[in-house]
Every structure is written in C-alpha cells, then in structure tokens.
C-alpha cells in the first residue's frame, strides 16, 4: 500500500489532466492521497478534488508558511472557521516555517505555526510540517510539546540527519 502524504493536485496546473493523474496514481498502487491546504485561495479547489475522489483524497486545512504576510490574522481566522465548523479535515497542514525564500515575516510565521499547533491539540488532529532552512526555529517551537499527544509528519525538511533525530525525540512525528 502506498500513501501520498502530501499532494497539491488541486492547483490549476493539474486541472486539464487530473483524471489521468488520479488513474495513474491508483494503477501505481497509491491507496490514499492527503492534500494540504496552502491558504484561503486554495480551500475550495482542494475540497472540490477531495469530494470528487472520496475515499481516495483527504483534505487538510492550514496556512502555509510562505503564505504568511501582513494579512495572516485574517487567513488564520478562515482556517479556524473551517476547523470549528467541519470535521472533514484529517490534519492541519501544511504548516511550519520557511526561511529559504524570505525572512521578512519570520515572527509572524512562528506565531502562525504555534497557533496551528494549539489547534491541532484542541481538535485532536495530526500536523503536516513544512520545515525549510528553519530547523532551529522549528525545534524551539516544538520542544515544549514533547509530552503532549501532538503527532505529525515533516515535509520539505532540509535539516541534517542529526537534526531529524533530534526532532523525532520530541514525540510521535515522522520525517
């Protein structure tokens, strides 16, 4: 059984050939595809794909770190509204920190990451963590959750194997 833990097949680049992509995935042995949200502009498209492929595609809700900007509070409010009114989401993601492209909103990325971790605990959902060039900050944010029921997986992890081992000591996570 193969599980795709992270796919953005709802973006417009896949619109034309999405049925063929899904067919190829199923023929290749993929049993499930988990789809992390990016920001408020992608929620409807993501949910539409998941509804078109029930039992195969599963939605996640979250605010991607590269989408964190001066309007992050409004974006978080949208995420929280979906979390508090719908039980269709299987995880909170894609969340985390990305310092590869830009560090302008680092403080805000950290606040957004922390808030979404708290929601994961509140709603009993795993998290999908985007960690690009941000190990030290990710570790500082996650270390206080060492003895909590927080679970999740790391995506786009650019750290070393030693850093990955350190993160895995925090709790039930996969890199």
Which residues does each PLM region occupy?
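Mid-domain alpha/beta scaffold segments of enzyme catalytic cores
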Residues: 1-172
């Amino acid at each position: 059984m193969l599980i795709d833990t992270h796919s953005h097949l709802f973006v417009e680049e896949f619109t034309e050939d999405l049925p063929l992509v899904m067919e190829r995935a199923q023929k290749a042995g993929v049993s499930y595809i988990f789809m992390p949200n990016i920001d408020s502009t992608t929620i409807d498209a993501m949910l539409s794909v998941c509804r078109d492929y029930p039992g195969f595609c599963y939605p996640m809700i979250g605010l991607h770190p590269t989408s964190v900007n001066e309007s992050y509070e409004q974006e978080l409010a949208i995420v929280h509204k979906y979390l508090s009114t719908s039980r269709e989401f299987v995880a909170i993601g894609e969340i985390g920190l990305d310092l590869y492209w830009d560090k302008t909103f680092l403080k805000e990325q950290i606040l957004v990451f922390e808030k979404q971790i708290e929601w994961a605990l509140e709603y009993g959902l795993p998290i999908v963590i985007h960690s690009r060039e941000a190990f030290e900050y990710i570790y500082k944010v996650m270390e206080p959750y060492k003895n909590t029921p927080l679970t999740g997986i790391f995506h786009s992890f650019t750290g070393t194997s030693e850093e990955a081992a350190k993160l895995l000591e925090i709790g039930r996570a996969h890199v």
